[in-house]
Amino acid sequence: MTVYKVPQKEFAFILDEIVGYEEHCKMPGFEDASRDVIDAILPEAAKFFEDVVAPTNYLADSQGTQLIDGVVQTAAAFDGVYQQMIDGGWCCLNGSTEYGGAGLPGVIDVASQEMLQSSNSALSLLPMLSRGVIHALNLYGSDEQKNTYLENIITGVWSGTMNLTEPQAGTDLSAVQTKATPDGDHFLISGQKIYITWGDHELAENVIHLVLARIPGAPEGNNGISL
């Protein structure tokens, strides 16, 4: 069984001596995230990732993910674990309170991410990809899109992905050929994407895909790619 111990003294040193958290939490919006509050949250996070998530690391790698009758089945070791992440609010600690998040500073979410990545790197990619979708929606999403997607993704009920890679386009995104054709208030997507991290699974109720594609008339190369 995998054994992982969170270096809590190192975390405290970083928060106090490098980040200067006592001043950091005085920033607008973080008034309720005092050092005392964080001192209560991080040990609970450590306990969860040490006791619940870390034991899945070896087991999940041994069991693997399977495609059964066209349905993706993740490792049995994950049964109930991701739901506990949702229930504990560990999927995205800095998610906006407006959309069901805890509204904590990003540095605290990073601490939680490090614990998850250290306890099970494969599972950590699930909320990591969701964070990318959350970030994109926060920056560029319409109010309708934010209201439709953010709460479920921030809480982890839904997960998100980024669809980049194609058979002929790996790290060279200028070779992306997938097309997005406008059709009323939406787009028709045509093309093939491969190697999409956590692209399909049963742990979340829904999987939201952000797709890199080209709209009609787009120039060649990276400048012609839309999200």
Segments (PLM) and residue ranges:
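Amphipathic, small/basic residue-rich leader segments at the start of a protein or domain
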Residues: M1-S124, T148
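Short, well-ordered loop/turn and helix-capping segments at boundaries between secondary-structure elements
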Residues: G20-Y21, S118, H135-D143, T155, ...
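Core alpha/beta catalytic barrel or barrel-like domain that forms the active/cofactor pocket
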Residues: C92-T97, S119-I134, G156-E166, S226-L227
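Flexible loop/turn segments at secondary-structure boundaries
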Residues: Y99-G103, G132-A136, E144-Q145, Q168-D172, ...
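Internal maturation/activation junctions in enzymes
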Residues: L129-S130, G141-D185, Q192
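Short, solvent-exposed loop/turn segments at the edges of secondary structure
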Residues: R131-G132, V157, L173-A175, A204-I208, ...
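A short core secondary-structure module
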Residues: H186, S190-L227
